[in-house]
């Protein structure tokens, strides 16, 4: 998103957390970003200790910190954070003050002690493709969504807006859990089982819709880029799918998680399965056979073959 903003003509400061020096060092030397494999000329860089300087004069803040770190980063930023929209690409659920699984925007509001003017950026948007100018359709959700769209949308980045921040955030959080399950299904039945994959995908969307509506979101949000679009691209390739595929082929989930974690590849889907299951339980949404099966295999040690063979829905 930093490259998108720069390409739109904005003056951009790219700030890195205390974990991001290996990413910033080559960029500062004029070399390629290690993950994007692109040079990022024209960006001003700021290190972890320069957060206040990075925020000075900002008219828009884009937050790409993962769900484990977003609260701590915004807590540190709070004294210097201007009253401007915060566009978040962070996906997940967090524990709120009521000790329940909650949306990120609600927990961020508690952390900052004020309305954070939060805009959630949802939809299928793989970072490398966005940075390389590949056509991408995103959904910005929140009361400042239009101003965020004006700043970042255009060209290859198509942006629709909605006030349904509950629906958009939940789609983003839930899709990692269901993408892991779809990968698990593919690993179990094989790559040529197209009927089974389609059935599982349709059920995932139905369950996401039930959870979104139960939490006050709208069904139509699930049927757009935030839900169907993001689940499709996440389930097609990537670490969440790979995590599920290995489990589907018979590897114990705990061993796959340990192996991928040791390689720095542990997916958000692992924690997302637990938080999605908790979110559903706390809100009394019970008829979720696919999520129940995914959780049973990944977190309760259920046999993947028996669980998936017994799975029924429709």
What does each of the following model-derived ranges do?
Residues 110-117, 135-221:
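Internal alpha-helical scaffold of NAD(P)-dependent oxidoreductase catalytic cores
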Residues 182-186, 213-314:
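NAD(P)-dependent Rossmann-like dehydrogenase/reductase catalytic/cofactor-binding core
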Residues 22, 68, 99, 103, ...:
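Conserved active-site and cofactor/substrate-binding residues in soluble primary-metabolism enzymes
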Residues 88, 117-122, 159-163, 223, ...:
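General beta-strand structural signal in soluble alpha/beta enzymes
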Residues 6, 153, 281:
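Anion (oxyanion) recognition and catalysis
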Residues 42-44, 48-135, 143, 148-150:
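Rossmann-like NAD(P)(H) cofactor-binding subdomain of soluble oxidoreductases
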Residues 1-38, 44-49, 78, 107:
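NAD(P)+-binding Rossmann beta1-loop-alpha1 motif at the extreme N-terminus of oxidoreductases
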């Amino acid at each position: 998103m930093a490259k998108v903003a720069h390409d739109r003509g904005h003056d951009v400061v790219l700030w890195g957390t205390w974990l991001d020096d290996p990413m910033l060092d080559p960029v500062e030397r004029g070399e390629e970003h290690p993950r994007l494999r692109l040079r990022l000329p024209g960006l001003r860089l700021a290190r972890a200790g320069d957060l206040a300087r990075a925020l000075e004069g900002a008219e828009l803040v884009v937050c790409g910190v993962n769900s484990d770190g977003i609260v701590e980063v915004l807590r540190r930023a709070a004294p210097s954070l201007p009253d401007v929209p915060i566009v978040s690409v962070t996906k997940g659920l967090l524990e709120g003050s009521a000790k329940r699984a909650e949306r990120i925007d609600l927990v961020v509001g508690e952390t900052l002690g004020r309305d954070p003017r939060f805009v959630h950026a949802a939809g299928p948007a793989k970072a490398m493709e966005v940075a390389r100018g590949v056509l991408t359709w995103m959904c910005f959700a929140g009361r400042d969504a239009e101003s965020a769209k004006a700043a970042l949308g255009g060209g290859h980045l198509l942006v629709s807006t909605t006030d349904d921040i509950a629906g958009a955030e939940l789609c983003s959080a839930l899709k990692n859990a269901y993408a892991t399950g779809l990968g698990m299904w593919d690993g179990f039945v094989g790559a040529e089982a197209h009927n089974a994959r389609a059935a599982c995908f349709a059920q995932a969307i139905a369950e996401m819709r039930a959870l979104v509506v139960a939490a006050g979101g709208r069904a139509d949000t699930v049927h757009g880029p935030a839900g169907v679009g993001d689940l499709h691209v996440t389930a097609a390739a990537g670490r969440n799918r790979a995590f599920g595929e290995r489990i589907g082929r018979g590897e114990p989930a705990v061993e796959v998680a340990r192996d991928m974690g040791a390689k720095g590849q542990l997916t958000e889907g692992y924690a997302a399965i637990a938080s999605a299951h908790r979110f559903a339980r706390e809100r009394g949404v019970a008829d979720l056979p696919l999520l129940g099966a995914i959780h049973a295999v990944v977190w309760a040690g259920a046999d993947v073959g028996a669980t998936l063979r017994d799975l029924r829905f429709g």
